[in-house]
Amino acid sequence: MAIYITNTETGKKEELKTIEPGVVKMYVCGPTVYNYIHIGNARPAVVFDAFRRFLEYRGYKVIMVQNFTDIDDKIINEANEWGVDFKDVADTFIAEYWKDAQSLGIRAANFHPRTTDYVNEIVDAVEKLISKGYAYTVENGDVYFSVKKFERYGKLSGKKIEDLISGARVEVNTLKKDPLDFALWKAVKPGEPSWDSPWGCGRPGWHIECSVMSQKLLGDTFDIHAGGEDLIFPHHEDEKSQSEALTGKPFARYWMHNGMIITRGDKMSKSIGNVFLVREAVKRYGKDAVKLFLLSKHYRTPIEFSDEIMMENKKAALKVLKTLNRFEEKYPYPKVPKRDEYMNDIEQKFVEALEDDFNTPKAIALIFDLSKELNKAMDEGKDDEALKRYHLITRVFGSILGLFEGGVKISEGENTNKVIEEILKVRQEFRKAKNFEAADKIRDALLNSNVKILDTPDGTKWEILEVEE
């Protein structure tokens, strides 16, 4: 069967036909590294990591590029606030990104280029755009792309130039020939890092970096460009326009965009101040709950984030993990089951769901069904049937989506009991010191980990809560 994806440029679901048979070349916009990543940042990373896994399962060789924007106004501002070099900020948060990515089981792309490693190539690209008449310099050393010179501007986002001119989003800049024009090169300002160029010292604009890095690593035209829908305009529109002006060729054949994370009615964003960091989410809800949350809705739809919703995902993830744990305790060295019509049929349904515009909600529903069947098979002593379902959940479906593949144990072993008892000793010390706020925080943290405590006249009692089936 063919794979179909929704192409943002056409607004239609299209069959994936790659430039080179059996190979998918894919670029995913990565983070600007000035802070820790939040759940909103994690959605494209998780979604397109899973999509890449699925493509590999279907036999494609995937060449994936995800960039790091390591020079930007936000990075410079952060460096000035800390009193350090901008490279220290970028290096710090690239390292922190990898910690968060690892905590979610996100695999590295084939290439992770950094903007500052491609400045010479960016300067060359800007020079070519100037020579072709698509860009111009201004008196302070800035270089701008002339939007009206590129007739197809607005094709990706569906925006018309006349509407943009009157729109509130257009920045007023008297140096530009037209208010819609965007920066390819920014002239140096006092205290900012800079690089030499024919127009004087400065640094790359945001959009040109992705054009240059993607085309250098994947070619002038590649298969898929992906990212969050908030990047469609202006970032991806500008990127597409300057790339096609530069080469005279189509840029990306397909554009995939994930929906936003919504919290308290707004897009999750550092600028709004409504973010929830990935590391906080993994600590509070667990890796599989976070990934379940990000994959249980179709990738193109927005997702509402709240503690209540996350706790529901945590409960759902724990149901599956508890079932898998039960199987692994009974069969510590599970073998590979013999393929039969049932396994082939279920796997085909799973694959068909993902072939249809990467319908992860439908695919995940099959995992939950298998988990229930696995429990039933163990209850009835049907070992072979249990093994088939365990194999599909962990080694096939879980491997494709990056779910339930970590072998998490949630049993009440001797070590678990000792840890809880030690935590309760610390809590008791806080209670003796009348630091009830700290004691309550420990109580709440234990409850979030499904450990219920009760203070009685005979001391503190505790129990591990059963996860409802």
UniProtKB/Swiss-Prot annotation:
GO term, biological process aspect, one: cysteinyl-tRNA aminoacylation
Binding residues for ATP: K270
Compartmental location: Cytoplasm
Molecular functions per Gene Ontology: ATP binding; cysteine-tRNA ligase activity; zinc ion binding
Renumbered ranges of motif 'KMSKS' region: 267-271
Subunit organization: Monomer.
Protein name: Cysteine--tRNA ligase
Lineage: Bacteria, Thermotogati, Thermotogota, Thermotogae, Thermotogales
